[in-house]
Every structure is written in C-alpha cells, then in structure tokens.
Amino acid sequence: LSEIRVSGNGRLRPGYVTSRLWPDTEAPFNTNLLQERFLLLLQDPLIQRMDGGIRPGADPGEAVLDMNVVRERPYGLTVAGDNRRPPSTGSLGGMATAWLRNLTGYGDFLDVSYGASEGASEVDAGWSFLLNSRDTRLSARYSYSENSVVEEPLKSIDIESESESFDVTLVHPFYRTLRHNLEMGAVLSLRESKTFLLGTPFSFSAGDENGKSRVTVLRLVQSYVDRTTDHALALRSTFSIGLDLLDATVHGGGVPDGKYFAWLGQAQYAHRLGEKLGSLVLRGDAQLASDRLLTLEQFALGGATTVRGYRENELVRDNGFDVSAEWRYPLWRASSEGGSDKLLQAACFMDFGSAWNKGEDPWDNRLHSAGLGLLWESKWLDAQFYWAYDIEEAPPRQDYDLQDDGIHFRVVFHY
C-alpha cells in the first residue's frame, strides 16, 4: 500500500486517518488487517461514515487506497434535570454541558459543565488530546463547587463548604480489537475541601485541620471492555496511593489523613435476552482502604447510582460495596427517519450495599431495596424514573424529600 488519499475530512487532519489505517506504508499489504483497522476507525466518535476503494498504484505491485470520510458533528450540548443530589444541599437541580471535538485537528476533546441546585453550584471543565496514532491520551480536568446546607434543622446555622480538584490523566490502550479493549493509565489527583460555620472555618469531620483537608493521590487505573451484539462487560480497577506531597493533610497516629492506600473495583454487565424479553443489567462497586480516610476519599452509598430507595450519600465510610440486578423489558419501540430509535422500557430491580469504617462490622450498616422503573430513550431525549422500597428502613428525617419515598428521576436533552 503505497498511498492513502483522504477526502471530505474537513478540519480532521488526513494524518489522523492514515496513521490509524496503515501506520507503516512499507509493510506488506494485508486485506484482513486493513479491514479490521477500518472497522475500528469507524468506532471513532469523530467519524460518522467512511467509504474506501483500492486501485492499482503507479508502479507494479503497489496499491492506492482512496478514502472518503464523513465527519461526525464536532459539537454538542446536553441539559439535564434530576433529583440526584444530597437533600442537605437541595436534591432537585440541573446541569448543562457543552462539548467540542477536534478543536486542534488532532482528535482532542473539550467539555465544560455548570450545575446548580438550591444550595449548591459546580463548574467542571476538561480537555483531552491524543499523543500518537496508538491513541495514548493525555487529559486534564478541573472542578470547583460551593455548597450550603438548606435543610432544617441545620439551615439556620449557616453551614457552607467549598471543594476543588485538579486531575491529570495518562491512558494507553494496550490491547484493542473489534470486541476487546484493555487500557491502563495513571492519574495524579489534587483535591481540597473547606468547611465553614457562620462564615468561620470549622471542622466537621475527623482529620480536617481548621475546616480544611487536602489530598495528593496517585491513581493506577486498569479497564477492560468486552462487547458483542448480545452482551457488554466493563471492568475497572483503581489503586489509589495517598502521597505526602503538595501540602497534603498528614497526621499519623490513626487519625484520618491524606496518606493511605485504597482499591476501588467497578463492574457492569449487560446481556440481551432477546428482542421480546429485554435485557439484564448487573452492576457492582467495592472500595477497600488500608487506613482511615478523609471525607474527600470515602465511599458514598445510597441514591440513584448505588442503592436506590435511600437518600444520596446515606452512608459515607472508608470501605463499602454495592451490587444491583435489573431487568429491562421493552414496552414500545419505533424507528424514525434517519435511523434513530425510540424505546420505552419497564424495569424491576434489586439493590444491596454496605459501608463501614476501619474496625467496624461490615454488616452493621446495610442498605437493601427493590423497586420498579420506567425508561425512555431517543435521539434527543433520555429519561429515567425509578421507585424503590427500602427493605432496610432508613432513619426518619425532619425535612421531607422525594428521595425519602424512594423516588429517583433524571431527564436529559441532547443537542
């Protein structure tokens, strides 16, 4: 293969396509290898469609590949509303996210988000870009949030907090086929939290220094995805090592601080049972820590993404796990012009989890629920509504919230 000619690529640089299709033009031509790389490139979010043809080159034994690339839309906007926040700062809220792909022409991705509820606001921004044709990716992300307690009886004493984080991530795909993807990487994470009472710094958690805690963490990440037409399996493992660097909070003597070791494991499996039987979704998370942790790094349990039927962050501890099984049954499906589907599904599920600090019995703080849900998926709108019954009864609250009745919902508009 002596040459690859790319057309229709717009701002996407031709080298982005050619280096992934055939990085070594001197290598012997292999149709099967080219086809696999072609199909892998079709999975790239920058590309909507590709058409190619091979013709003889100028010299005997040479071939030229003509490629016509149709780019995917390089920008987008999502607006979401839900009740997936802790009631103490206002569970009802919204978030808007704008994103832009390929700003430089080298496959980078830029996104900015802003979210707010009655007592909270947050800003999040990230930029990632590819370092080479092997898709080694470097990314940076910054987030900042302000929170005020708006729930009685604590609202009147003016409790506030600020959180800030900055992450730098380097990830490389070590093995990639049309079915499998194995990635490993490292993250340097800087996180800081400040808490205030009546406008004055105040410590509410063990390990804080005058209302302030700070961690510098090295995270080693491994992820694996196995995907076919009938199932998808995603596994992720994160080893976190708290470092005594960059003014991290360090005490010693058994007091929670930023010098620690912890492991977080995450798994999700989805299996299509058949066109009329729907799908089965299994999920699980677990965190184990060798030491007492600052609140910044603890495991949060309860709410829409862990154990439904309870308040968001019902339990916050050093260690914890949650598992979930959900069956989704299709009620109605329709295909519209342009090939986009509309799907309405009913769901039934069961969630279970536990969280504990070092030295505590893991079974003393259990959350267990079962319930029903309704899900809508379409090109422009996704919506979820879940109701769950708390089998392990939650403690009564003075201020009522929808989450106390096991109601969790989310609506997302895509543009």
Positions of PLM-derived features:
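C-terminal transmembrane beta-barrel domains of outer membrane proteins
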Residues: 239, 250-415
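Transmembrane beta-strand segments that form the barrel wall of outer-membrane beta-barrel proteins
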Residues: 75-85, 96-102, 106-118, 123-125, ...
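Transmembrane beta-strand segments of outer-membrane beta-barrel domains in Gram-negative
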Residues: 137-293
